[in-house]
Amino acid sequence: MSYQPTPEDRFTFGLWTVGWQGRDPFGDATRRALDPVETVQRLAELGAHGVTFHDDDLIPFGSSDTERESHIKRFRQALDATGMTVPMATTNLFTHPVFKDGAFTANDRDVRRYALRKTIRNIDLAAELGAKTYVAWGGREGAESGAAKDVRSALDRMKEAFDLLGEYVTSQGYVLRFAIEPKPNEPRGDILLPTVGHALAFIERLERPELYGVNPEVGHEQMAGLNFPHGIAQALWAGKLFHIDLNGQSGIKYDQDLRFGAGDLRSALWMVDLLESAGYEGPRHFDFKPPRTEDLDGVWASAAGCMRNYLILKERAAAFRADPEVQEALRASRLDQLAQPTAADGLEDLLADRAAFEDFDVEAAAARGMAFERLDQLAMDHLLGARG
């Protein structure tokens, strides 16, 4: 298998990823700003399928209408010249100080109304550029102190905002769905909708739930100490995996945004295995930050590494699934039984079945080994290149 990516692999990058200048809370930028046109051209050369953006990534905040149109025109020309697509867009509702207390859930009503108008304006651009998914990350929606935010009212306002946005895209006839991106712990101390589970529960309360799904990110779920592939599996099970952000993370700490494959490599293997086996057809979107130690050559090497690592893990996962010893180990672990209904015969027959309870040999069942260690070691062998 070739590890050289092509557009058919559907790899995408945000302008803000390779465009991150290395500025953090403790240090200034270490790299110059990248022109979005340059980003499109370089990513196309690397084999990417598309590029995504926040409104302020493409059009500097405060630009006049004339300046805005000029930025859009140059960007569109770069897309046309390279064949790159824009499968997703989003709104920056977190950088400007006006959003210091949030956007859709800010205590100030006028800020909430401004946030909705800012979002709607960029939705129009997203639809114009062909995006099918609109991501919403509520990074400033939350609090640091208990009395500062009535969470129930804040969730009411969050619901109101998404219902209005759903009404808007429906009224405009846009073929666009929303993907809510959960994240815990930063930048607000306590953020609303911090995990996939929170977001899935919230979506069920919306007026048009079919328009809303989730955009899980590797590092975000791991920041909460959760299993990312399990979160992805539940989103798939619910029919709500509308988009996905791939990067690397090493356990419960700040949002590292390492290149994909760095950090928890075992989790990355199972995530790729799941996406490929489940038939996920959306973009494989990399939301990472090239370390501030790197110059621009290092930025592009980091982006290329994201795609290469995905393709290597895709090959490793396929070899694992095709290995006859693995298939035997899966049977020994009785995974095939998990796929069978527990009581397809119905409640009445279950209650009448003495083998299910009265005559069930608890001790014999307890003594049965599950053979999980053999199965897991085979996975490790494939991951480490010792098999296949």
UniProtKB/Swiss-Prot annotation:
> Which residues does the annotation say bind Mg(2+) 2?
E217, H220, D255, D257
Q: Which GO terms describe its cellular component?
A: cytoplasm
What does the record give as cofactor? Answer: Mg(2+)
An MF annotation (GO) of this entry: xylose isomerase activity
Sequence positions that bind Mg(2+) 1: E181, E217, D245, D287
The record's cofactor note says:
Binds 2 magnesium ions per subunit.
Output this protein's name. Xylose isomerase
Q: Which organism is it from?
A: Streptomyces olivaceoviridis
Tell me the active site.
H54, D57
Annotated transmembrane regions: none
* Annotated catalysed reactions: alpha-D-xylose = alpha-D-xylulofuranose
